């Protein structure tokens, strides 16, 4: 009985730790007062002010565009990489998988600084393009991680049978292989999309002047002082328990 009660208390404390910051943001985003210490009544004017802020809206557009484009390109490259690795010998495939996993094992700040130095050495102009390339780079391993297990579950005999029956390689791939790996591809795309939306550190090191995502824009605004509409903006970008 005591053990069960202790477990419930422990679980309750975990949920409080996870959700208390989000609840605080929700309350403050509806507070009519500009000060955090005083409750000035219920209002939605900060949400209206948020959507009237052109800089925030531009940052939102940049964030969504980066997430969609990087996820699509990373999914395409990652899927092709999985198909290529599946035809390799086991030793070569293991080595390549190890190399592919390095970006996931690295601290984000290491990846961000490395990419920044690479772009500087290449003389690249920092902006939307450098952020997009960076997001594609760190998203590809997550796509491979999602697609590769589906590739390993494939029965090569079905693909070979389709070829023996006169199907072209392209037709056999899209009719036999693609339907089986599609769940992994979709999972990889969603993972890449989420990681891109969630990223701050790598974006911060590879963005140019005048180009912001929601995370970097919020960081810039908070340094100037927290405006009430920032609570509303933070609510949309608040971390889930997965991030915590």
PLM regions and their residue ranges:
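Transmembrane alpha-helical segments of polytopic membrane transport and secretion proteins
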Residues: 1-12, 242
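Transmembrane-helix boundary motif in ABC transporter permease subunits
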Residues: 1-5, 68-100, 117, 173
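Amphipathic cytosolic juxtamembrane alpha-helices at the membrane-cytosol interface
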Residues: 2, 65, 89-97, 154-187
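Transmembrane alpha-helices
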Residues: 10, 15-22, 144-147, 155-156, ...
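Short membrane-interfacial helix/loop motifs at transmembrane-helix boundaries
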Residues: 20-54, 204-209
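Membrane-interfacial helix termini and adjacent extracytoplasmic/periplasmic loops
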Residues: 35-37, 44, 109-139, 170, ...
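Glycine-rich helix-loop "coupling/hinge" segments at transmembrane-helix boundaries
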Residues: 35-41, 200-228
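Single conserved hydrophobic/aromatic residue that forms the stacking wall/gate
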Residues: 236-244
């Amino acid at each position: 009985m005591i053990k069960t009660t202790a477990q419930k208390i422990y679980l309750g404390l975990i949920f409080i730790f996870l959700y208390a910051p989000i609840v605080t943001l929700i309350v403050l985003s509806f507070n009519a007062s500009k000060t955090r210490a005083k409750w000035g009544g219920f209002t939605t004017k900060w949400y209206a002010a948020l959507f009237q802020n052109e800089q925030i809206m531009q940052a939102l557009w940049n964030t969504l565009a980066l997430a969609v484009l990087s996820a699509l390109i990373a999914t395409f490259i990652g899927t092709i990489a999985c198909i290529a690795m599946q035809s390799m010998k086991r030793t070569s495939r293991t080595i390549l998988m190890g190399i592919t996993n390095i970006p996931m094992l690295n601290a984000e700040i290491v990846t961000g600084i490395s990419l920044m130095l690479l772009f500087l050495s290449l003389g690249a102009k920092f902006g939307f393009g450098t952020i997009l390339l960076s997001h594609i780079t760190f998203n590809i391993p997550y796509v491979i991680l999602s697609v590769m297990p589906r590739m390993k579950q494939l029965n090569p005999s079905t693909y070979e049978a389709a070829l023996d029956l006169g199907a072209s390689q392209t037709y056999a791939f899209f009719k036999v292989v693609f339907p089986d790996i599609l769940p992994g591809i979709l999972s990889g795309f969603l993972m890449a999309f989420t990681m891109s939306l969630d990223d701050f550190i790598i974006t911060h090191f590879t963005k140019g002047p005048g180009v912001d995502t929601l995370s970097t824009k919020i960081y810039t605004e908070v340094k100037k002082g927290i405006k009430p509409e920032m609570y509303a903006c933070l609510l949309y970008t608040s971390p889930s328990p997965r991030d915590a």
